[in-house]
Amino acid sequence: MSQLRLLLFRLGPQARKLLATRDIAAFGGRRRSSGPPTTIPRSRGGVSPSYVEEMYFAWLENPQSVHKSWDNFFQRATKEASVGPAQPQPPAVIQESRASVSSCTKTSKLVEDHLAVQSLIRAYQIRGHHVAQLDPLGILDADLDSFVPSDLITTIDKLAFYDLQEADLDKEFRLPTTTFIGGSENTLSLREIIRRLESTYCQHIGLEFMFINDVEQCQWIRQKFETPGVMKFSIEEKRTLLARLVRSMRFEDFLARKWSSEKRFGLEGCEVMIPALKTIIDKSSEMGVENVILGMPHRGRLNVLANVIRKDLEQIFCQFDPKLEAADEGSGDVKYHLGMYHERINRVTNRNITLSLVANPSHLEAVDPVVQGKTKAEQFYRGDAQGRKVMSILVHGDAAFAGQGVVYETFHLSDLPSYTTNGTVHVVVNNQIGFTTDPRMARSSPYPTDVARVVNAPIFHVNADDPEAVIYVCSVAAEWRNTFNKDVVVDLVCYRRRGHNEMDEPMFTQPLMYKQIHKQVPVLKKYADKLIAEGTVTLQEFEEEIAKYDRICEEAYGRSKDKKILHIKHWLDSPWPGFFNVDGEPKSMTYPTTGIPEDTLSHIGNVASSVPLEDFKIHTGLSRILRGRADMTKKRTVDWALAEYMAFGSLLKEGIHVRLSGQDVERGTFSHRHHVLHDQDVDRRTCVPMNHLWPDQAPYTVCNSSLSEYGVLGFELGYAMASPNALVLWEAQFGDFHNTAQCIIDQFISTGQAKWVRHNGIVLLLPHGMEGMGPEHSSARPERFLQMSNDDSDAYPVFTEDFEVSQLYDCNWIVVNCSTPASYFHVLRRQVLLPFRKPLIVFTPKSLLRHPDAKSSFDQMVSGTSFQRMIPEDGPAAQSPERVERLIFCTGKVYYDLVKERSSQGLEKQVAITRLEQISPFPFDLIMREAEKYSGAELVWCQEEHKNMGYYDYISPRFMTLLGHSRPIWYVGREPAAAPATGNKNTHLVSLRKFLDTAFNLKAFEGKTF
């Protein structure tokens, strides 16, 4: 190889000259023969070194195997390469060499010039976007850097970078296969090459795509943008674009005239976003998409609702009326946060299309994973594995796109098998400012869109004051998504004509920018003048279009005054047809029984302890676990993992789709679940026995997630939005880690129904328990969930027949801490069998997963049984309640510590222990019954958490309300602390010992006042 490289180094020009002759098989032939080929394939790519190497090695092996011209060339080349400069040469050879050198010099120059042109073309493809004219204001460079790459020919003197001269500008050069600027031509002059490259890469569109590591995808983009004449629009397309711009701009103008002092976060400065979104939807509809799910922030949201989703204008305008009364319970939300669902005909394609705009909070980008989850679910229920029928569009602000970490988390879900939505079109409203923050202070990367490079998503920057460029880019983006099932980003470089909101004064912080903005001609006028000048429309037609839309707005404004009541349910983004009655209420308020037939339990247990596939070798340790499950099934008992298996399996039998997601959920953080079996002999061969229960069962999805909480929990929340007939669960690796998803919990799960009248049945499984494992592996922070529960601690409830189910219907979420596998089984089934949906927070155990006493009998799970909100004392103390001196209430794992300690002290008759399985809504009725039963006993709340954490601050005032402050509820547990747990095992055991001693010291509270 080194010999060949030396040879080519010395005689490269001759080799290229030889390749260029028509009697040699050119690059692309790839055919060896004893004679010249009958047809000679030509290539615009020039010389292929690999082809020369191929010929050379073939010649070394057998000189007769190559064409005679190659044989002559290699013989001469080898001979000349072996002659050193110090060796004497015969006069004839010297004369021949001089002629050869002269020829070589010319050939070398020609080849080098062609190579320079190829490098030049590649330079524009890679770096042309840096000098594209993207800022409508002409103030900023879109990449925040005024540096011009030295390999772009922005001035004549730059030709020297490639060792080219001005005289070369009119020379013809063969174009490589990696460009389409020639169209049908194979050669162009250097001047024309530069002109076409400038036109493609350095005008109002800046393309970032050369980092993509797929040649086909790069070629596809090059062809879409480099081919001459691709951006030509018909008269009808231009008129449609103008009409859409009219609607976009006049809508904002109308709001500004009618409600000049109201916040609306208008779209002025980026009015082109409306035709941009409509183009993406039109093109996608043309390619077969039937359902588009959108997520976006507040900027321009009302305009999107009006002109993209096509919400009735009077429904939007009436929201500006301060006297409008809310018909729905709950807080409601501001108008620029509300969602929408609408089915209509797409006028361009004449096809049905469903558009959903997902409601979102002010927390920027938080809606991104929610939209992706909802999209994934809609694709799943339609059987749309390739994303041909359902797609998502996400609209972002430039500052948030660069600044919010959830954007990165969401991008990294885009190609995971259980999370991909087969491509999302991202539209960035890049108004070059974040509230008052200059982009130079808002990001370290050149562009706000650089985060998208991590998933090889192409990025199309476009000047928003060039509507035709915007529309073309959006059309290509929709095609890209349909062709490659990958994300794509459209960066609309625009400006913000007003302040962050309409009451804000931007001149305080951006005086020079806003001086320019005040001079800026609106894009509608620019484009209208252009079309009028070229004769596409007349001035009269343009004015009539404006008057027409103004009239539509005025008429809607008149109708809006008749609206006296606001129905938030009319703004629902995810309706569930047939689940509620016509008024949006549950069809019944019956509390479900959640037990199942014993033969179903046995069947699920047998499948859970087997391997349904033949010749599937599992790990020996797993064989032991499966044998244990089989043994429990025979004995009619279940542990925690088997109870979960039976809950899931029974729901699958009833046609309920189950999806479990989170970090390491397939095996389980604590190696207890093992829902996915792995063949020990065949790499990546897996088996999910849960999908082999019944022939006609619903599908079960269990999937390890990326190491993300915020993004993945948001995704699962969105997934649960799509249908009520599914059990969607997210499990934290440890309950402590849920707080990195706190935004989703606070803004969507806890408050979603109150703000947006949106039911959601998502389940959070949060491993929790004080076991001496340190402050980050102990607490799921139950106090936070209970603090956000909306039941009134001071309101004494009325105990009606349907009190239990009414409590559940009125709450914002359900919080449980199950102490038995049976309770866990029932609460999971109840979650789906209730006639409505509420989020369920489950504090799940760790050590109880294998605790010998933490088992349940089939008798507690068979037909006729149901979830017990409270499990009362059933031992000797319950037989003689009048003799009981202390009644301890507790929840979760600490129950087993208390029972063990009570037994060791022989206090079974003096101390009763009652467990709360459901903490919120608080089981007032059951607590009252238990307190009355032990009327002479001292009441104690015992928890293993610290006093300022856990449950005490929640249960204490409710006990007081229930008991009329007549009996105190004493606290037993750990002292207040800053950290949730200790990392020192000895300290943990000492504190455990201390509160257990207090719990069973019957004189501990003598003389104390409550």
Swiss-Prot record:
Highest taxon, organism lineage: Eukaryota
> Can you name a GO cellular component term?
mitochondrial matrix
Which cofactors does this gene product need? Answer: thiamine diphosphate; Mg(2+)
InterPro entries per UniProt: 2-oxogl_dehyd_N (IPR032106), 2oxoglutarate_DH_E1 (IPR011603), DH_E1 (IPR001017), KGD_C_sf (IPR042179), ODO-1/KGD_C (IPR031717), THDP-binding (IPR029061), Transketolase-like_Pyr-bd (IPR005475)
Q: What is its EC number?
A: 1.2.4.2
Reply yes or no: does the keyword Magnesium apply: yes
Q: Which residues bind Ca(2+)?
A: 130, 143, 145
| UniProt xrefs under Gene3D superfamilies | 3.40.50.12470, 3.40.50.970, Multifunctional 2-oxoglutarate metabolism enzyme, C-terminal domain (3.40.50.11610), TPP helical domain (1.10.287.1150)
Keyword Zinc-finger among UniProt keywords: no
| Transit peptide limits | 1-107
Question: A single Pfam family, by name?
Answer: OxoGdeHyase_C
The protein's UniProt keywords, in alphabetical order, are: Calcium, Glycolysis, Magnesium, Metal-binding, Mitochondrion, Oxidoreductase, Thiamine pyrophosphate, Transit peptide
Tissues where this protein is expressed: The OGDHL-containing OGDHC complex is present in the brain, but not in the heart.
- What is a biological process (GO) this protein takes part in? glycolytic process
Region (Disordered) spans which residues? 28-47
Named from the GO MF annotations, one term is:
oxoglutarate dehydrogenase (succinyl-transferring) activity
Can you say what this protein is called?
2-oxoglutarate dehydrogenase-like, mitochondrial
- The species is Rattus norvegicus
